[in-house]
Amino acid sequence: LIMKINQILDKIDEHQLYVPAFQREYVWKRKHVKSLMSSLINEYPTGTILSWETSSPPELKGKSKYHETQGAVKLILDGQQRITSLYMILKGEIPPYYTEKEIIQDTRNLHVNVETLELEYYIKQKMGNNPLWVNLTDIFKKEIKAHQLVKDLQVKLGDDENIEDERIDLIHENFNKIESIKDRDFLEQSIPIKATIREAID
């Protein structure tokens, strides 16, 4: 099965995709998320997720409750660290199956240099006065657009220096490259609905 990243995140919001309570907590650190986002930007493979479709799920993580009227739902058995990281970066929020307190290291606030595609967590001295450094989440949420950034950069440079066309094209191209991550295919292996919980986790 192939699912796009934004479809996976939408299914979480639409109560169709859950994390079982027996899954370990979110333990990824910033370096892991930086590496994942770098792989996605460079279009490298990022592994598969393993899900289990069931109409009798075990206890679910967080406040999620299953109602029989929902029919079959999917549980993430493997890939939860990646999915949680993507949810936090693309949406800028903690996914519904966690609370803020349960997130050991908040991996949001990852910035990208839209000219070089370098990724770093926010450092005021390096980024505070440089329009090229943008919070990745702001790009995914369309809170900043390439043309606006080019304008901000021109203001910073002043009237004496014009931005070269090649540089403008590169910034637009990099914005598109980042925005296209949400449409990237994620391979999903699905355990059949008739499997028992023991078979699913084996």
Give the predicted meaning of each segment.
Residues 4-30, 34-202:
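Basic- and aromatic-enriched surface patches that contact anionic nucleotides/nucleic acids
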